[in-house]
C-alpha cells in the first residue's frame, strides 16, 4: 500500500503527529477504471455499480503547524484536514444487500483509549456515502485522467473530529460491515 495507508491493527506510535484528530469513515473501492467520458454520464445508481467493496476506515488528521489547534484561525483554516494516515479494515463485497441499505439506520461506534465508546446512528452528512461517487469521479477525471480500478474513496466522518492522544488505541466499529483499529 502507499505510504500513509495502513491495514487495521497498525501501530503508529513512533510516527510524529502535531495533532491526532480521528474520523471514522466508510471507504469504497472502485471495481474498474473510469474514464473522463464515462464520469460525465454517471448517475448515483451507475456510480454505485462501480463500487466492488467497502470497509471501515480510520482517518488520522494532522496539522502542519507545530502549535496545531493553537494556530491563528486563518492558519488553521488553511491547514486543518492535513492527511496524517488512513487505516483500512477488511474489505467486504459491495453486494446487493448494500444497494438497499438504509444508511440512516447504520450504527457505528468509536472508542479512543480508555474513554467509553461513543455510538452514532445515521450520522453521515450525506446519509448514503455512495452518493458522492459520480461527483467525485467527475472532479477526479476533469483534467483528462482515467481513475484506476482499485482506487479507494473515503466518504466523510461519522463521528465529527474528536481528538486522540499518543498511546491511545482507536477502535471503529460499523455494525454489519466491520471493525478497524489503530494504535497511536
Please provide the spans of the model-predicted regions.
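Active-site proximal loops enriched in glycine and acidic residues that flank catalytic Cys/His/Asp
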Residues: 156-157, 174, 184
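Glycine-centered tight beta-turn/hairpin loop motif at sheet-sheet or coil-to-beta transitions
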Residues: 114-115, 175-177
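A conserved acidic, glycine/proline-rich C-terminal tail/linker
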Residues: 132-161
Amino acid at each position: 500500500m502507499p505510504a500513509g495507508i495502513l491495514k487495521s491493527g497498525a501501530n503508529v506510535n513512533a510516527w510524529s503527529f502535531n495533532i491526532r484528530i480521528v474520523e471514522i469513515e466508510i471507504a469504497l473501492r472502485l471495481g474498474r477504471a473510469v474514464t473522463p467520458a464515462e464520469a460525465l454520464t454517471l448517475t448515483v445508481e451507475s456510480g454505485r455499480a462501480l463500487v466492488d467493496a467497502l470497509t471501515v476506515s480510520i482517518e488520522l488528521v494532522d496539522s502542519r503547524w507545530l502549535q496545531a489547534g493553537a494556530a491563528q484561525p486563518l492558519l488553521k483554516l488553511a491547514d486543518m484536514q492535513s492527511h496524517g494516515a488512513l487505516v483500512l479494515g477488511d474489505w467486504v463485497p459491495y453486494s446487493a444487500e448494500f444497494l438497499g441499505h438504509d444508511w440512516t439506520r447504520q450504527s457505528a461506534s468509536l472508542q479512543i483509549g480508555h474513554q467509553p465508546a461513543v455510538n452514532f446512528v445515521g450520522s453521515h452528512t450525506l446519509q448514503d456515502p455512495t452518493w458522492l461517487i459520480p461527483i467525485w469521479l467527475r472532479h477526479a477525471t476533469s483534467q483528462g485522467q482515467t481513475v484506476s480500478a482499485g482506487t479507494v474513496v473515503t466518504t466523510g466522518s461519522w463521528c465529527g473530529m474528536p481528538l486522540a492522544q499518543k498511546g491511545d488505541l482507536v477502535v471503529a466499529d460499523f455494525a454489519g460491515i466491520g471493525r478497524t483499529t489503530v494504535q497511536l
